[in-house]
A protein has these predicted regions:
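Transmembrane alpha-helices
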Residues: 128, 132, 165-198, 226, ...
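Transmembrane alpha-helical segments of polytopic membrane transport and secretion proteins
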Residues: 1-20, 240-258
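C-terminal transmembrane helix and the adjacent membrane-cytosol boundary/short C-terminal tail
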Residues: 91, 182, 225-258
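Short cytoplasmic-facing helical segments at TM-TM junctions of multi-pass membrane proteins
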Residues: 141-180, 212
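Generic hydrophobic transmembrane alpha-helix motif, especially the helices
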Residues: 102-137, 144-145
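Non-cytoplasmic
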Residues: 183-233, 243
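Periplasmic/extracellular loop-to-transmembrane helix junction in inner-membrane transport proteins
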Residues: 6, 32-74
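Transmembrane-helix boundary motif in ABC transporter permease subunits
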Residues: 71-101, 114
Length: 258
């Protein structure tokens, strides 16, 4: 007798059910509260999202925020790789960097935003804060990934006089990649949260953070939720695209014969 397929609690069907259940709970809460100044339902939010997508200012705000935050992330990504390589090669470099990394990890993001407002214009602050918040995460994981490279393979590479590039490509990169990908999962979400928070506090014009601030001031709760939905959608798409590109580059670098 054929066994019935078991329900997979982590499968797509389960995830879809959980999402639909969350929407139902959201709609029920909106109906029970019955106050649009406190909570609006998903139907109203979806309608407002569609309206916003038809407005030019929406795309300008999304483009501005995406450009600034992605710039901050990419700069932090490159800086983390360089600093991790230096720290792995020279112990004194890690010692010198440690106070700065600890400071960024422990000081509240709001403090950095307020300080940055004294140094930078409101339209540049999101890139700076995104860079600052994700750098320690990327640096720590990149350093750990480099140090996890097999020492026996590195010694063999030294004996056979492999070039530095081949050592990096064939030994260090396969060890580094999982740590880097894990760090990017965390950092990509963190940079959007911190960057948009900076825009809200700085009241940056024509940015997602600025739109969220305006929605709060004018009690446009539908706009507040709609901009949040758009922000989440853009951040998810950016994360998926970057991780796909990272996997592609790593795999091609490892397989490359040169």
């Amino acid at each position: 007798m054929a066994r019935k397929p078991k329900f997979d609690p982590t499968g797509r069907a389960a995830k879809l059910f959980a999402a639909l259940l969350a929407l139902c709970v959201w709609q029920l809460a909106a109906v029970l509260i019955h106050n649009r100044l406190l909570l609006v339902g998903p139907v109203q939010v979806a309608r407002r999202v569609i309206e916003l997508l038809g407005e030019k200012t929406t795309w300008e705000a999304l483009g501005f925020t995406f450009g600034r935050i992605s710039l901050g992330f990419f700069l932090a990504f490159l800086a983390a790789l360089v600093l991790a390589a230096l720290s792995a090669r020279f112990p004194w470099a890690e010692t010198l960097l440690r106070p700065y990394i600890l400071a960024v990890q422990t000081v509240p993001v709001a403090s950095f935003i307020v300080i940055a407002l004294l140094w930078l214009s409101s339209r540049r602050i999101s890139a700076f804060i995104a860079f600052l918040m994700v750098l320690p995460v990327l640096y720590a994981n990149a350093l750990q990934g480099i140090r996890e490279a097999d020492p026996q393979l590195l010694e063999m590479a030294r004996v056979f006089r492999l070039s530095g590039l081949r050592r990096v490509r064939c030994i260090i990169l396969p060890s580094l990649a999982p740590y880097l990908k894990s760090a990017c999962h965390v950092a990509l979400g963190l940079c959007w949260k911190a960057g948009v928070a900076a825009e809200v506090m700085a009241v940056a014009n024509r940015s997602v953070g600025g739109m969220l601030y305006d929605a709060k001031v004018y009690l446009e709760i539908s706009d507040l939720f709609a901009w949040t939905v758009l922000l989440v959608a853009v951040s998810i798409l950016f994360e998926k695209a970057f991780l796909w590109l990272l996997d592609l580059c790593v795999n091609r670098a490892i397989r490359w014969e040169g």
